[in-house]
Amino acid sequence: MILANIIPAQQLNDRKTMNKRRLTKQQQNRINAKQNENLILANGSEQNQGLLIASYGKYADILTANNQIVRCTLRQNLPALVVGDEIIWQAEQAGLSVVTALIPRKSELFRINYQQEKKLIAANLNQAIIVMAVQPDFSEFVLDSYLAAMALCNLKAMVVFNKIDLLNSQQLEILHQRAKLYKEIGYEVYYLSCILEQGLSGLKTKLLDNISAFIGPSGVGKSTLIKQFVPEESIVLGVISEATNLGRHTTTTSHLYRLQTGGVLIDSPGIRGFGLGKLARQQLYHCFIDIKPYKDLCKFRNCEHESEPDCALQQAVKTGKISLSRLNSFKKLMAAE
């Protein structure tokens, strides 16, 4: 043994003290969190898997495997969590339980602002149901924007025209004609009336064994639709946390409901409107499934699809392969680049 390399105990302790002083607050928090985790494991606390159904800052409501709701605090080293996240949580003997880990997400529902910042809204969906009210008259551009946003998220989308009881027979026929192009593109379209209980069974079938979100502008009847599919006791569960004053969520917090018939439904005020940000042109082509096949067929690479010669999109409109309203929506979003 080389005695010169042996560090005296007091000197070693002094070095540890100096190193500890050099630790940043963030580093110390990480160490403390890891120590707490080890302490919990040492005490034999059980690791549980759960589903985040609502979030309130430092707290979250977790749906357990036996369909109980547990209020948890969030481990500091976790990323921002959203409704639909699958997580690992641990029960505490004293105080609130704690969320300790995030299970990798299968999909993300998000929007992008003009600062190109990604705003995560929900996780692990496999379909989005875009709800449009027929009165007042819906906008094709708004609908196309929602469809483009879902394509950007790589989510299957379907369209619901709600409140059709407000239309007379002539207006209903016009609606069917306007919606026809979306069916031709490949989107599933449903016509609903909660008052007449019309069209609900067909949509209910689509909710089975899926994780779905109702998306659409305010005032289109999403809340009324949710009541048609969500058991009353589940809605009550979503209101539990109001009594704790840990988060008033009537207008600001997303909620997840488990359907009695199977499947999960997400309702969120945060998905009333979507921004696509400044999408690159190639990204925008990807968001319009009917226009995407023509993206490399124009004569000019920077074609604006107006009056340029040999514009593939204008030619497709003339031959009826693309609707003029869809092209106009595409160009309007393209102008926002």
Functional labels for PLM-detected ranges:
Residues 121-124, 133-186:
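Phosphate-binding glycine-rich loops and their immediate beta-loop-alpha structural context
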Residues 166-220:
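Canonical P-loop GTPase G-domain recognition
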Residues 2-151:
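C-terminal effector/interaction modules appended to NTPase cores
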Residues 223-235:
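A conserved segment at the C-terminal end of the G1
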Residues 2-17, 46, 81-95, 103-127, ...:
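Helix-rich effector regions associated with P-loop NTPase G domains
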